[in-house]
C-alpha cells in the first residue's frame, strides 16, 4: 500500500516519497487556465497548503512530478513562471512592527534569489519593485501564491486594536498586487475565514472567490468517491480487521468526519480527520485539537444558548456568509467559516434578502462543541 501523507503539505515530498495523492490537478488546471486573481476560504485541515504547493510546482514547470496525473499531458510545460510563495505560518506577526520586518526579510530572500537589490526599507515599495524587476529581468511574469492571508488578523482578534492595525498593514501590502497587474500571471490567496475580506480586497478588481462557486466545490477536501477510490486498501483492511462491512464503515466515516458543504449540494470529508482515523483505526476527535483557540472557546461559551440549539439540531440561519465585522463577531457566521457549521441551503425572504440554513456537519464537530460547553 502507498503511504499516508498525514501532516505533509508539500506536493514534491508526497510524490517523491510515494505517498497517496488525491489528484486535484483537473480542477487546478481549469482554475489557473481561466482566471487571474483568486481566493479560497476553507477550514484548517482541508489541504489548502498542499493545493498551493501543487500550483507552485505546476507554474515552475516541474513536469516530472505530475506523471500519471490529469494535468501531465494538458499543461504547456514549456511556459515556466517565477513564483513568489508567501506562507503566513512562517511570518512573525506578534506586533505590526514584527509583521513588517518579517515581510521585509521575506522580500530580501526573494530578491537575493534573483540577484536584485532592494531600495531602502519601505515594504510596499520594495514589494512592487521586486515583482516588476523579476518580470523585466527574466522576461517571465510572476505568480504570487499567498497561504493564510488572514492568519495575522485572526490570531490577533482577541486584541481588537492590534487586529485592526495588522489588518490595515495587510491591506496596504496586498494592494501592491493590484498595481502590479501587468507583471503578474496569476494570484492565489487562501485563508481560513472570509473575515474582513471587504477591507483587505477592496483595492482589487474582479477577485474570483471560488469558495462557494459551483465549478470548484471539491478543490479541497475529499469527496466520498475520492476517499473510497484512493484509500480503498486501508478501508478494506480496517473492515476485515474489525469485522465490519465496508459500506457500513464508509457510512460511519462520513457520519464522523464528512458532511461539509459550501453549496448544500456537494459534500466533503475532512482530510485531516480521515487520515488520523486511518492511522489510529479509532473513531475520535482529531481535527479540533488543531483548530481551537482561546478566542473561539470564549466565543462559544459566551453564546452557549445559540450553540446548544445547534447541537440539538434546531434550524439555524446565517444572513451573511462572507464578511465578519471585526468589532462584532457573529457566532454562527464565525463557526461556519471555521468549519464547525456547514451550509444546508440558500433561501430568500419575501424581501428578496438572501439567508442561509446551516447545521453541524458531523459527530466530530458536535463532540467538540459539547466538550467546550461542558467545561
Located regions from the model:
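Phosphate-binding site recognition
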Residues: 1-375
Amino acid at each position: 500500500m502507498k503511504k499516508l501523507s498525514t501532516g505533509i503539505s508539500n506536493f514534491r515530498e508526497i510524490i517523491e516519497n510515494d505517498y497517496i495523492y488525491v489528484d486535484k490537478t483537473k480542477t487546478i488546471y481549469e482554475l489557473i487556465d481561466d482566471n487571474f486573481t483568486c481566493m479560497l476560504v476553507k477550514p484548517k485541515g482541508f489541504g489548502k497548503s498542499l493545493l498551493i504547493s501543487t500550483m507552485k510546482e505546476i507554474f515552475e514547470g516541474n513536469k516530472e512530478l505530475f506523471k500519471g496525473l490529469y494535468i501531465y499531458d494538458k499543461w504547456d510545460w514549456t511556459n515556466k513562471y517565477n513564483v513568489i510563495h508567501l506562507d503566513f505560518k512562517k511570518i512573525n506577526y506578534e506586533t505590526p512592527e514584527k509583521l513588517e520586518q518579517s515581510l521585509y526579510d521575506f522580500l530580501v530572500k526573494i530578491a537575493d534569489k534573483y540577484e536584485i537589490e532592494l531600495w531602502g526599507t519601505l515594504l510596499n515599495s520594495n514589494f512592487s519593485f521586486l515583482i516588476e524587476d523579476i518580470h523585466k529581468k527574466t522576461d517571465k511574469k510572476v505568480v504570487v501564491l499567498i497561504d493564510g492571508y488572514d492568519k495575522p488578523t485572526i490570531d490577533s482578534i482577541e486584541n481588537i486594536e492590534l487586529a485592526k492595525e495588522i489588518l490595515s498593514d495587510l491591506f496596504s501590502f496586498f494592494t501592491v498586487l493590484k498595481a502590479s497587474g501587468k507583471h503578474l500571471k496569476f494570484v492565489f490567496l487562501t485563508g481560513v475565514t472570509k473575515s474582513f475580506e471587504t477591507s483587505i480586497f477592496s483595492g482589487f478588481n474582479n477577485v474570483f472567490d471560488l469558495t462557494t462557486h459551483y465549478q470548484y466545490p471539491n478543490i479541497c477536501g475529499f469527496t466520498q468517491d475520492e476517499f473510497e477510490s484512493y484509500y480503498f486498501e486501508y478501508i478494506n483492511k480496517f473492515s476485515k480487521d474489525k469485522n465490519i462491512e465496508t459500506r457500513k464503515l464508509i457510512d460511519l466515516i462520513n457520519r464522523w468526519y464528512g458532511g461539509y458543504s459550501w453549496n448544500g449540494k456537494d459534500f466533503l470529508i475532512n482530510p485531516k480527520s480521515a487520515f488520523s482515523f486511518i492511522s489510529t483505526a479509532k473513531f475520535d476527535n482529531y481535527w479540533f485539537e488543531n483548530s481551537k483557540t482561546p478566542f473561539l472557546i470564549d466565543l462559544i461559551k459566551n453564546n452557549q444558548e445559540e450553540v446548544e440549539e445547534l447541537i440539538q439540531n434546531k434550524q439555524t440561519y446565517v444572513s451573511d456568509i462572507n464578511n465578519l465585522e471585526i468589532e462584532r463577531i457573529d457566532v454562527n457566521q464565525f463557526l461556519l467559516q471555521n468549519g464547525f457549521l456547514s451550509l444546508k441551503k440558500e433561501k430568500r425572504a419575501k424581501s428578496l434578502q438572501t439567508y442561509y440554513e446551516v447545521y453541524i456537519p458531523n459527530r466530530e464537530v458536535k463532540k467538540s462543541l459539547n466538550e467546550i460547553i461542558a467545561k
